[in-house]
């Protein structure tokens, strides 16, 4: 399968798939709302140093991996939709407790408690997202539509990277961080309701289910792709640690829309390698103009370039992971992609806050070095992928 585009089938877009896709959007928005807002709250209101705030934000990325080895056992042992629902509900409860402690009790958080909170939040989101993307979304469609379902649902999560921070910054500007807490809880609750509205028939568990395993968690033979994706997202995480305004994230959304159009019309008959190469070149261009230019046009061009680059890179890497998967490993490929994407953003964000302390030139140079390294690495990774793909 060397086609650049995923075909669109109207029959895929039935009520249940819409509910799952929107649930993915809302759940991911709830997480991304905290990217630009929580570091401000930690440093300005909680009195954390930049190093402490960066460690706390980065702890989320480590939490993502903690429960992954148990995903296969949990969805076999319990009803798969309930595993996602309860993990998402626990996320909402954790944020609700944080809101109560911050707003109602007016308590200052200890550093170690905040690290634990972020780590736990990451572990719960990782579990919910693995079950949602690796099992529930593809269970709502026919087998021949699964690649399209993965592709389409992932775009909802991608748009959350602009919608979430945009919403969070607007709430913080006009109401305060307490509104961010409450909206985060609200988004998760609505996502839970949407998942609950979809009927998933009972599936008889396998006879010999191991409690710990890589099934639905991590694709070992996709490790080179995983590292390449993570390097790219580290650079993006570093970039997002800068104090951008709502305008930046609104323009990122424009970039995502342009990426969708480009996939539909520009990359239709292009070489398979072209999307990722183009995306990385465009992101490099965004970093360069942020480094070297101060004109008003930069505020529009740079975030559009970043959104466009992320859009085409994310879509292509997702399909690469699917093509690497063997029989019954589609769900595992989705989880591996999600972990590379999310952990890269989280660790880049944490490093940017902890180490650069507002020194944007050094941070942008580091991000540029990472993206150039990723581009060089991709020339080898793509050849490796072409030899090892299974679909």
State where each predicted segment sits.
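Helix-loop boundary and gating motifs at the non-cytosolic
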Residues: 4-61, 220-252
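Symmetry-related core transmembrane helices of the 12-TM Major Facilitator Superfamily/SLC fold
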Residues: 178-197, 362-384
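Intracellular juxtamembrane helix-capping segments at the cytosolic ends
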Residues: 127-141, 311-326
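C-terminal ends and interior cores of transmembrane alpha-helices
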Residues: 89-108, 281-295
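A late C-terminal transmembrane helix in Major Facilitator Superfamily
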Residues: 325-360
């Amino acid at each position: 399968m060397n086609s650049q585009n995923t075909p669109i089938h109207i029959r895929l877009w039935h009520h249940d798939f819409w509910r799952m896709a929107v649930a993915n959007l809302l759940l991911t928005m709830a997480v991304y709302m905290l990217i630009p807002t929580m570091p401000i709250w930690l440093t300005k209101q909680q009195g954390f140093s930049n190093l402490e705030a960066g460690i706390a934000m980065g702890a989320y990325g480590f939490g993502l991996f903690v429960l992954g080895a148990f995903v296969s056992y949990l969805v076999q042992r319990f009803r798969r939709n309930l595993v996602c629902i309860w993990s998402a509900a626990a996320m909402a409860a954790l944020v609700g407790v944080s809101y109560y402690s911050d707003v109602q009790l007016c308590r200052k958080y200890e550093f170690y408690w905040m690290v634990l909170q972020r780590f736990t939040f990451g572990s719960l989101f990782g579990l919910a997202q693995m079950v949602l993307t690796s099992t529930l979304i593809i269970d709502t469609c026919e087998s021949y539509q699964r690649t399209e379902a993965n592709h389409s649902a992932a775009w909802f999560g991608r748009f959350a990277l602009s919608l979430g921070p945009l919403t969070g910054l607007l709430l913080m500007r006009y109401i305060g961080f307490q509104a961010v807490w409450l909206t985060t809880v609200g988004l998760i609750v609505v996502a839970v309701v949407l998942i609950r509205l979809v009927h998933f028939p009972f599936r008889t568990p396998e006879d010999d289910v191991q409690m710990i395993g890589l099934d639905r968690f991590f694709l070992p033979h996709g490790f080179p792709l995983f590292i390449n994706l993570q390097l790219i997202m580290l650079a993006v995480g570093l970039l997002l640690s800068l104090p951008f305004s709502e305008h930046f994230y609104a323009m990122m959304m424009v970039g995502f829309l342009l990426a969708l159009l480009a996939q539909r019309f520009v990359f239709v008959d292009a070489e398979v390698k072209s999307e990722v190469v183009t995306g990385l070149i465009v992101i490099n261009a965004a970093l360069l103009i942020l480094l070297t230019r101060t004109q008003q046009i930069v505020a529009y061009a740079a975030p559009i370039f970043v959104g466009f680059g992320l859009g085409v890179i994310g879509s292509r890497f997702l399909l690469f992971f699917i093509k690497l998967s063997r029989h019954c490993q589609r769900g595992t490929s989705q989880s591996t992609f999600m972990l590379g994407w999310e952990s890269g953003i989280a660790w880049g964000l944490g490093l940017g806050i902890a180490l650069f302390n507002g020194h944007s030139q050094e941070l942008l140079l580091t991000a540029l070095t990472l993206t150039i390294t990723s581009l060089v690495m991709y020339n080898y990774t793509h050849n490796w992928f072409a030899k090892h793909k299974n679909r």
